[in-house]
Amino acid sequence: EAAILDRQELNVERDKNRPCVIMWSMGNESGYGPNTDAAIRWTKQRDCTRYVHYEGVPDNYGVYSDVNDFKFIGESDVYSRMYASAPHCKEYCESEHAVRPMMLCEYCHAMGNGPGDLKEYWDVIYSHPNLFGAFVWEWCDHAFYAGDAENGMPKFYYGGDSGEQPNSDNFCVDGLVSPDRKPHQGLKELKAVIQPVRVEAVNLEKGEFRVTNLFDFIYLSRFEC
């Protein structure tokens, strides 16, 4: 418990004055128990202005089968999940167990041909106020520039390319952008899905479209079609 509390106290004291911090996390994929609850209680006592989440709380060590088995263990303010399916999110948000808002602290793993199902997730998010957002894992491929290849293209090393052992092969290459921050196709898809102005075809033959404004404080009159 002392080690967990020490890390959380340092985390809060370091970042408490940063306005971009809207929520405290108790860690990542590190089990759950009374030590976690102790960290949650300390954090809420130190800073009562922000929510607290921990993905490990509702799982109770991963033991659950369906929406009717959701139990809120401990004192997390939100139902925080990783990689729950879009139908699962919809079912929770519409169930009698949805006593706390839901958040996907990880979803749509951007590895290989990913991320996928972005539109399906955001259809659920936009239609359910108690599902307040989701975070793609992850932003950037973890590799380093190793000069240019013979064809002139940049060469990036990862997963044992430098002879390091052990390694995780290509599991670190799972970002929305490349190491030099060039967008992958997944980032372009995500941008289209979460764009604040939506245009949908109603009747193409008649030239009818539905325009939806998802901005909170901006009118569409400032834009040109």
Predicted regions and their residues:
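Extended substrate-binding grooves/exosites of carbohydrate-active enzymes
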Residues: 1-210, 215-221
